[in-house]
């Protein structure tokens, strides 16, 4: 592990961007020993194991090149969708903005997901509410730059349908009235409300917006938890220099049977000052 960690640390010290993708978690086999109790635990476990697996397979060529963008993945778990089976699959994603205030993160995440899965478009993308400062309520202004980019992606046929997460009736109504491409779904966290709010239910029914449930924490990946996972996997690194920009979780479901064929995480991180 020592030599692996030193090589990985040297690469990360020179790179400016890290692209981490887990591949299909259902293909992990021996890497997946325990069943995590929360989404945050699963994610942290995935980040660490992906980093460990990647650092154990660093080639001498990579060390000589010192690439600016590092592609970190579990190679044996990568699984593209067979083009002949694409029509039978529903490809969904949820995008979490972590440390980025750039709407281009949305396009980067969708482009990378399409590339990883070998598809031309995603069937649905839900955006988690972007982070806001403590004491500040999420407003339409916070959502607009990300939604504009999602609309562009729908218009360029990169995404079929787009949705929101954790918007109350007022927020959803404001977005709906402003948006060119309307949200077709809104996720509600059942931990915060055991029963769907009646005003939200009525509005969603009126405008044909699907209300879904989720159990993601308010902050699935924090800067601190990412840096801790990085430090534990690769001790020879200045982990505090790295900031996660966004995280995308995807799933591929066989439409006719409702079973999950593939699921995984993709994230992008930047080194501060690079």
Swiss-Prot record:
Phosphoserine modification, residue list: 59
Coiled-coil regions listed: none
Residue positions where N6-acetyllysine is found in the record: 263
Cross-referenced Gene3D superfamilies: NADP-dependent oxidoreductase domain (3.20.20.100)
UniProt keyword annotations, A-Z: Acetylation, Glutathione biosynthesis, Phosphoprotein
MF term (GO), any: glutamate-cysteine ligase regulator activity
GO BP terms in the entry: apoptotic mitochondrial changes; blood vessel diameter maintenance; cellular response to leukemia inhibitory factor; cysteine metabolic process; glutamate metabolic process; glutathione biosynthetic process; negative regulation of extrinsic apoptotic signaling pathway; regulation of mitochondrial depolarization
Pathway: Sulfur metabolism; glutathione biosynthesis; glutathione from L-cysteine and L-glutamate: step 1/2
A Pfam family annotated for this UniProt entry: Aldo_ket_red
GO cellular component: glutamate-cysteine ligase complex
Subunit structure: Heterodimer of a catalytic heavy chain and a regulatory light chain.
Protein family according to the UniProt entry: Belongs to the aldo/keto reductase family. Glutamate--cysteine ligase light chain subfamily.
Protein name (record): Glutamate--cysteine ligase regulatory subunit
Species: Bos taurus
Source species taxonomy: Eukaryota, Metazoa, Chordata, Craniata, Vertebrata
């Amino acid at each position: 592990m020592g030599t692996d960690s030193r090589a990985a640390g040297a690469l990360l010290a020179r790179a400016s961007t890290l692209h981490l993708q887990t591949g299909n978690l259902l293909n992990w086999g021996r890497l997946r020993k325990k069943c995590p109790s929360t989404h945050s635990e699963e994610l942290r476990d995935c980040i660490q194991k992906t980093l460990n697996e990647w650092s154990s397979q660093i080639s001498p060529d990579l060390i000589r090149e010192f690439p600016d963008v590092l592609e970190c993945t579990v190679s044996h778990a990568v699984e593209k969708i067979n083009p002949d089976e694409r029509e039978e699959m529903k490809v969904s994603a949820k995008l979490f903005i972590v440390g980025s205030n750039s709407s281009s993160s949305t396009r980067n995440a969708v482009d990378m997901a399409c590339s990883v899965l070998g598809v031309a478009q995603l069937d649905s993308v839900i955006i988690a509410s972007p982070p806001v400062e403590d004491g500040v309520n999420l407003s339409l202004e916070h959502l607009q730059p990300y939604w504009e980019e999602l609309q562009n992606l729908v218009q360029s046929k990169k995404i079929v349908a787009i949705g929101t997460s954790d918007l109350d009736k007022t927020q959803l109504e404001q977005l709906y009235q402003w948006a060119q491409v309307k949200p077709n779904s809104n996720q509600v966290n059942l931990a915060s409300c055991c029963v769907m709010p009646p005003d939200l239910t009525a509005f969603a029914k009126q405008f044909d917006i699907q209300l879904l449930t989720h159990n993601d924490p308010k902050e699935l990946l924090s800067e601190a938890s990412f840096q801790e996972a990085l430090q534990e996997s690769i001790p020879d690194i200045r982990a505090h220099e790295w900031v996660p920009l966004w995280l995308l979780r995807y799933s591929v479901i066989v439409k006719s049977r409702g079973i999950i064929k593939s699921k995984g995480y993709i994230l992008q991180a930047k080194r501060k000052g690079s």
